[in-house]
A protein has these predicted regions:
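Fe(II)/2-oxoglutarate
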Residues: 1-157
């Protein structure tokens, strides 16, 4: 998480460290200094919540993903939802809300459509009624299409 967001610009360093007889030895005070650096980062709520959401929503087992072939276009998903079809969540997929953010399998769902994101988090089956006005939002529909084409949600055949 730290490396992916380039938050690790502050690196551990000790200009007073002496050459050791055993180069693999790490002294307790060095471990304490590194631990303090990590605690300082964890004390920043925005970083901790984001890391926690990514970490806790990652599947611990391989998911039985079956991306649709051919992939759906956003217009197709829109039409199916308008016709009353419902999207089913893949079994074992972790979809969680941490604060006001939604995470799917270790990824932040970046949308302003919080009610629709909440519907994805709380329901194993979602339809146009649950998603509300979000289905008319092209950016949300693009996000939903990406989730379906990843195999995370699917339409029953």
């Amino acid at each position: 998480y730290v490396l992916a967001r380039e938050l690790g610009s502050k690196r551990y360093g000790d200009p007073d460290v002496k050459l050791r007889e055993h180069p693999a030895e790490i002294l307790p005070q060095e471990v304490d200094a590194l631990r303090q650096m990590m605690l300082d980062l964890v004390q920043q709520p925005e970083h901790f919540q984001h890391w926690f959401g990514e970490f806790i929503s990652q599947s611990r087992h391989e998911l039985d993903l079956a991306p649709p072939e051919p992939p759906y276009q956003a217009g197709e998903i829109y039409e199916l939802l308008q016709q009353g079809e419902a999207l089913q969540r893949l079994g074992g997929l972790r979809v969680l809300r941490v604060g006001d953010r939604c995470f799917v399998n270790g990824e932040l769902i970046d949308t302003d459509q919080l009610q629709a994101a909440d519907a994805l988090c709380q329901n194993f089956s979602v339809d146009a009624a649950l998603l509300g006005d979000a289905v008319d939002d092209p950016s949300f529909l693009a996000l939903l299409t990406a989730l379906v084409n990843s195999g995370y949600w699917y339409f029953n055949d």
